[in-house]
Design a protein with these regions (language model features):
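PAPS-dependent sulfotransferases, especially Golgi type II membrane carbohydrate sulfotransferases
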Residues: 1-25, 65-109, 116-182
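Glycine-rich phosphate-binding loop used to anchor ATP phosphates in small-molecule kinases
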Residues: 11-45
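Beta-sheet entry/capping signal
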Residues: 28-29, 50-54, 106-109
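Acidic-histidine catalytic/liganding microenvironments
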Residues: 34, 48, 103-104
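Acidic, metal-coordinating catalytic cores used for nucleic-acid/nucleotide bond scission
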Residues: 35-36, 114-118
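Hydrophobic/aromatic-lined pockets within catalytic cores
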Residues: 39, 49, 131
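Conserved phosphate-donor/acceptor-positioning beta-strand/loop module used by diverse small-molecule
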Residues: 44-68, 126
Length: 182
């Protein structure tokens, strides 16, 4: 019943707004790229019915290798084991298929590799999906001075680079579980 109560929904929205203020972020639009957001798409839609979900997919082996190398902490222990990564990734794919069947109009799939190859085309798709006006500065995101709180802050301040595409190939001899299961 908590989610049926409009007062509770307002309070939850307000709490999230307070959380965002911790990052000195005052813009009308925000991007929350927390790695586990995919688990909460139904809840996100309930709290923020106008929210758009940009689902950036990537080659599963490259994606899992990236997670493995990042040494995440706090609830992301599945990233420390190839077997756990494979299981988690398959569960993630299943859950995303469910969310897309429930909320097809709020989820846009963008392939990471396509974004790297033709970033202008893919960024324009995102802008259109979000009902925003195109601004050529979107191509120069790395020059934006807005606050960023993410493990990849240094990457976000650089132009798009291609070195992560097919990065798994260099390590495939050490990650046989990922290679065989994904």
């Amino acid at each position: 019943k908590i989610i049926d109560d409009q007062a509770n929904l307002r309070k939850l929205r307000s709490n999230y707004g307070d959380f965002i203020k911790n990052f000195n972020y005052t813009e009308k639009y925000i991007t929350d790229k927390a790695p586990l957001n995919f688990r909460w798409i139904g809840f996100i839609n309930l709290l923020f019915p106008n929210a758009k979900i940009i689902h950036c997919t990537r080659d599963p082996k490259n994606n899992c290798l990236s997670m493995f190398k990042n040494l995440f902490e706090g609830g992301l222990n599945f990233t420390y084991s190839q077997e756990d990564l494979v299981e988690y990734y398959k569960n993630y794919q299943e859950l995303m298929n469910f969310w897309k069947s429930q909320y097809p109009d709020i989820i846009l799939d963008i392939k990471y590799e396509n974004l790297i190859r033709n970033n202008e085309l893919e960024i324009k798709k995102i802008i259109k999906f979000c009902n925003l006006e195109w601004d050529k500065n979107c191509l120069f995101f790395h020059k934006n001075k807005a606050p960023i709180k993410t493990m990849s802050t240094s990457q976000a301040r650089k132009p798009i680079y291609k070195s992560s595409v097919n990065s798994f190939d260099k390590f495939k001899d050490y990650f046989k579980v990922l290679e065989n299961e994904l």
